[in-house]
């Protein structure tokens, strides 16, 4: 699967998942998805948010707990065979947890933008994802899911 094909596949699968859960993930519909489906959705949120505004945007938009503190990093590392990427997400999660209250607080646009300097490590993690992981991991995620999904 080429990179472009994997992006199309990822978006198609996750669009269907989002439709199935009624448009937005919530506590009341979490059990409608399998663990592998949650991994696909978590990766979609991660990829979309980090490509647009880094991990700071991902966290500010409310995806931090689901993507970084949920089972997604551990599943990648232990079951999906993506040890290095899973560990990378654990490193991001450690930085997130250390600054969680400040990162999740409501902010003006100006204060939000200032976080990119204030939390330089998270900003660098976003660059690292884009430079070192995104083009390699996206096809691996799509291929793993396609090969292991329930038929």
Please place each PLM-identified region on the residue numbering.
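Non-transmembrane, aqueous-exposed alpha-helical and coiled segments at domain scale
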Residues: 72-74
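Extended, alpha-helix-rich binding/interface surfaces that flank or overlap catalytic cores
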Residues: 1-56, 60-69, 79-151
């Amino acid at each position: 699967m080429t990179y472009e094909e994997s992006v199309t596949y990822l978006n198609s699968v996750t669009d269907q998942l989002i439709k199935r859960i009624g448009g937005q993930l919530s506590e009341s519909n979490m059990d409608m998805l399998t663990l592998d489906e949650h991994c696909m959705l978590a990766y979609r949120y991660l990829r979309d948010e980090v490509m647009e505004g880094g991990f700071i945007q991902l966290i500010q938009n409310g995806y931090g707990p689901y993507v970084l503190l949920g089972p997604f990093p551990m599943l990648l590392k232990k079951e999906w065979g993506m040890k290095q990427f899973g560990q990378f997400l654990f490193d991001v999660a450690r930085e997130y947890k250390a600054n969680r209250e400040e990162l999740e607080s409501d902010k003006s646009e100006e204060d939000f933008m200032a976080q990119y300097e204030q939390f330089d490590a998270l900003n660098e993690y976003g660059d690292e994802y884009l430079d070192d992981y995104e083009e390699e991991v996206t096809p691996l995620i799509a291929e793993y899911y396609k090969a292991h999904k329930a038929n």
